[in-house]
Regions:
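Conserved HGGG/HGGXW glycine-rich cap/lid loop of the alpha/beta-hydrolase fold
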Residues: 4-53
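Conserved alpha/beta-hydrolase catalytic His-Asp/Glu region
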Residues: 140-198
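Catalytic histidine-centered segment of alpha/beta-hydrolase-like enzymes
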Residues: 238-251
Length: 263
């Protein structure tokens, strides 16, 4: 599958994966901070952004997304890149780490480490946000996001500091949630089928937003039990999408996680 992507920088390759209904531009504030030391590939996952659709028989699980990323790497000649993912992209990154097909994995507030209540909460928030945003024309949404109070009300569950993101950027980011592609409903209906890896074959780092309201940082305890060798850090002042809240902190974490390790 030929995934839409943006490439910049030079050095060891780092693949950046976004969350559900998001897009590769969600990494725009982080990518320039990495590009001086890494070759950065920001990628739209299948059925997101400008990438092709998933097949009609897609059942909502993670495996086909990881398969598509692996196929993309083969097509681009990327041999075992580092991979970094947020939310859904974080779970895909951990799946690739379990397969051993990447050099290292960094996951930011990865999905899947929820209890039943946490899973129902995530489904309710995402489904409710879609229902709220779908009837609002883009121009009207842009006007609403220009108001600090409404911007916080609309995206405060995703960002701890919504004021740090340009309203035009947020409007574009929310398009995938207000007008999602077919996999969105399939994924929401089958969140209980998302299995989390029980091993990592490569060095693995996790950053969890201290102020994540969608997937609270308490879920990191489940991750620690599943992946005891992972290095887990709590990201102060960050919500569910830390790339928007503190791009410098995220870049620092990624650069540290992707530095060559002593043999």
């Amino acid at each position: 599958m030929d995934l839409a992507h943006t490439r910049t920088g030079s050095g060891e390759p780092v693949l950046l994966l976004h969350g559900i209904t998001h897009r590769r531009q969600g990494w725009d504030l982080v990518a320039p901070l990495l590009a001086g030391e890494r070759e950065v590939w920001a990628v739209d996952l299948p059925d997101h952004g400008e990438s092709p659709d998933l097949p009609p028989e897609y059942t909502g699980d993670i495996g086909p997304l990881a398969d598509a990323v692996e196929a993309f790497c083969r097509t681009q000649g990327l041999e075992r890149p580092h991979v970094v993912g947020n939310s859904l992209g974080g779970l895909v990154a951990l799946e690739l780490a379990a397969r051993g097909t990447v050099r290292s994995a960094t996951a930011l507030s990865p999905a899947g480490f929820w209890s039943r209540a946490g899973r129902l909460w995530a489904r309710a928030v995402l489904g409710g946000a879609h229902a709220l945003l779908a009837p609002i024309p883009s121009a009207r949404l842009r006007q609403m996001l220009a108001t600090p109070f409404l911007r916080t009300a609309l995206v405060g569950l995703l960002l701890a500091h919504p004021s740090r993101i340009d309203p035009d950027q947020i409007t574009a980011d929310l398009h995938g949630l207000s007008h999602p592609r077919s996999s969105f409903r399939t994924m929401l209906a089958h969140l209980d089928s998302w299995t989390v890896p029980q091993r990592a074959a490569v060095p693995t780092t996790v950053g969890w937003g201290a102020r994540d309201l969608l997937l609270p940082r308490s879920q990191s305890k489940r991750l620690r039990r599943a992946l005891p060798d992972a290095a887990v850090y709590i990201l102060p002042g960050c919500g569910h999408v830390p790339m928007g809240d503190d791009p410098a902190l995220v870049a620092e974490l990624v650069l540290a996680a992707t530095r060559p390790r002593p043999a």
